[in-house]
């Protein structure tokens, strides 16, 4: 069959799938033309930058139509590989800091750059967090796990190999329940969880003009960061389930404190393995699966769903033409919703060899038991418990889900509610659990983030004593009791704004200010502002001093207008003078 004939047959099949109707040969030709026009319009939309969001919607709609057409005949089978950075302060095998957004190559130890003579040393915190994840997901914790070298050449991998745990991982087995909609769940089995080191980052820049050359620069800040790779069984059916499963893992990683799992920062990256089979062939154990293809480095839930839908349709079209699906690794372009080949899997030989410089990780039964005692419940368990109508203080499901975003938030809410009930008992008033929850996940969390007084990943973890759940509970009990406050020379009942003002007094107003207003919180906030606005800082130092107003405005926004502008201005001046 000529290439032209094959292309015509493919276009004909796309037209039939899109219109869902039988046709004669003449009508089929017309349908193929319609399909090509629809496809051209969808691709054309993606080339217009001002309508990127509508183009994504068009791509999604196109994929959904094609999926629906073959829904009765074919089944899409998906497995996931998730790579999540763990929340250790330093890297897996070196003492360099793990810090997103740092200056290029600022956090690189000799081992990260593969300098001769440098040796790895395992990060105990990374081992602890990987063990916690395995315990929470019901996996078997290996008492002895081993590292090995996975060899391949890439510019952002200076060693020429990645240290990983393919054959003897720290965790085998486990499961997670995925909400697939309409009140149904699917149990997704986990093959293994392994520790491995991350690669660096390649940044490609193309010069101006039509014939501009592409320059690749390497940032090794990420190289060597500790990753947990979660490999699942092919238990998912379709793109929406794959996206829902990735979201469930993200919530779990955050809730357990294993990592922040921010896809936009690259601290959670997802690969999908996609195959198709005729409906009714094989069972859940993967029998009679078609050949699979892997799509790498998906960084949003929408991209996961779209990539799976496109791959499934591509596989069905190949089979319909009598062609074989080749096992290969592919990339995904979110602009047009299509995948493209990266490499054929048969050509790869990673030459796995034992890692001679890292001894096995040996865990005692006592160590695993201690971690199991400290491991919190999974998010779905916490949500069910908080929303259980049989309890004394059941929350609406949406509010319970917000409270269970982090284990620390759930613990804080329950401690604040308990303190509020104790404080309200002598006053003979009832405390509304939902009101406490709304304050904790709304006002309190927002103010904590603006004031930068806690961690970025878990905002209610490690708060100062003045923000303890006991104090918050007592203040909320006073609100419930209708106690009054005098502001503007007029007494009125206390409200949430008064609670916020009591918890967050004006910054730099006598709290450690000292001479020059050197309040530690203001200083830290101003340094954070300067670090987060490098372009403005460069312009400021080049003579555009009016930008000081922008820095002060950002500080006032973060403190909700309660900071003293003079104190902030002095702190910003010091921070700008320290910035190199």
Swiss-Prot record:
Catalytic activity: L-glutamyl-tRNA(Gln) + L-glutamine + ATP + H2O = L-glutaminyl-tRNA(Gln) + L-glutamate + ADP + phosphate + H(+)
GO biological process, one term: glutaminyl-tRNAGln biosynthesis via transamidation
Cell location: Mitochondrion; Plastid, Chloroplast
Pfam families, sorted: GatB_N (PF02934), GatB_Yqey (PF02637)
Region feature (Disordered): 20-64
EC number of this enzyme: 6.3.5.-
Ranges of compositional bias, category Low complexity: 20-35, 42-59
GO molecular function: ATP binding; glutaminyl-tRNA synthase (glutamine-hydrolyzing) activity
NCBIfam families: gatB (TIGR00133), PRK05477.1-2 (NF004012)
UniProt function note: Allows the formation of correctly charged Gln-tRNA(Gln) through the transamidation of misacylated Glu-tRNA(Gln) in chloroplasts and mitochondria. The reaction takes place in the presence of glutamine and ATP through an activated gamma-phospho-Glu-tRNA(Gln).
Name by which UniProt lists this protein: Glutamyl-tRNA(Gln) amidotransferase subunit B-2, chloroplastic/mitochondrial
């Amino acid at each position: 069959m000529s290439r032209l004939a094959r292309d015509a047959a493919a276009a004909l099949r796309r037209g039939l799938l899109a219109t869902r109707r039988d046709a004669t040969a003449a009508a089929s030709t017309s349908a193929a033309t319609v399909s090509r026009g629809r496809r051209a319009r969808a691709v054309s939309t993606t080339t217009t930058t001002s309508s990127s969001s509508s183009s994504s919607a068009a791509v999604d709609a196109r994929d959904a139509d094609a999926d629906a057409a073959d829904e009765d005949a074919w089944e899409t089978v998906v497995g996931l590989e998730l790579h999540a950075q763990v929340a250790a302060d330093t890297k897996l095998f070196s003492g360099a800091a793990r810090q997103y957004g740092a200056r290029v190559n600022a956090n690189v130890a000799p081992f990260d750059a593969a300098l001769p003579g440098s040796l790895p040393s395992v990060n105990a915190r990374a081992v602890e967090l990987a063990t916690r994840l395995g315990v929470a997901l019901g996996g078997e914790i290996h008492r002895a796990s081993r590292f090995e070298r996975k060899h391949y050449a890439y510019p952002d991998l200076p060693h020429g190999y990645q240290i990983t745990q393919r054959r003897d991982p720290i965790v085998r087995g486990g499961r997670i329940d995925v909400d697939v909609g309409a009140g149904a769940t699917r149990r997704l089995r986990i093959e293994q969880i392994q520790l491995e080191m991350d690669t660096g980052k390649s940044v490609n820049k193309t010069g101006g003009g039509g014939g501009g050359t592409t320059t690749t620069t390497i940032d090794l800040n990420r190289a060597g960061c500790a990753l947990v790779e979660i490999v699942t069984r092919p238990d998912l059916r379709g793109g929406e389930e794959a996206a829902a499963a990735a979201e469930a893992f993200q919530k779990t990683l955050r809730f357990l404190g294993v990592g922040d799992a921010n896809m936009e920062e690259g601290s959670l990256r997802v690969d999908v393995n996609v195959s198709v089979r005729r409906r009714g062939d094989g069972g859940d154990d993967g029998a009679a699966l078609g050949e699979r293809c892997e799509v790498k480095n998906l960084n949003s839930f929408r991209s996961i769903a779209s990539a799976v839908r496109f791959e499934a349709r591509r596989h069905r079209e190949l089979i319909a033409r009598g062609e074989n699906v080749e096992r290969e690794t592919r990339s995904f372009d979110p602009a047009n919703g299509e995948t493209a080949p990266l490499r054929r899997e048969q050509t790869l030989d990673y030459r796995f060899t034992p890692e001679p410089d890292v001894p096995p990780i040996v865990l005692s039964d006592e160590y695993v038991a201690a971690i199991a005692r400290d491991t919190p419940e999974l998010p779905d368990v916490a949500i069910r418990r908080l929303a259980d109508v049989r309890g004394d203080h059941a929350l609406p499901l949406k509010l319970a889900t917000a409270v269970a975003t982090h284990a620390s938030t759930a613990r804080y809410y329950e401690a604040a509610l308990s303190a509020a009930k104790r404080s309200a008992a002598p006053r003979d008033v009832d405390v509304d659990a939902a009101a406490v929850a709304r304050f904790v996940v709304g006002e309190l969390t927002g103010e904590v983030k603006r004031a930068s007084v806690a961690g970025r990943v878990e905002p209610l973890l490690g708060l100062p004593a003045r923000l303890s759940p006991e104090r918050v509970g007592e203040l909320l009990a006073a609100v419930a009791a209708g106690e009054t406050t005098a502001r503007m020379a007029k007494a009125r009942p206390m409200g949430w704004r008064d609670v916020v003002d009591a918890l967050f007094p004006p910054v730099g107003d006598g709290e450690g200010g000292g001479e020059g207003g050197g309040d530690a919180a203001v200083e830290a906030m101003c340094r954070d502002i300067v670090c987060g606005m490098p372009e403005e800082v460069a312009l400021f130092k080049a003579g555009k001093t009016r930008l000081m107003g922008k820095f002060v405005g950002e500080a006032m926004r973060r403190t909700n207008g309660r900071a003293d502008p003079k104190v902030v201005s002095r702190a910003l001046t010091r921070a700008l003078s320290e910035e190199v």
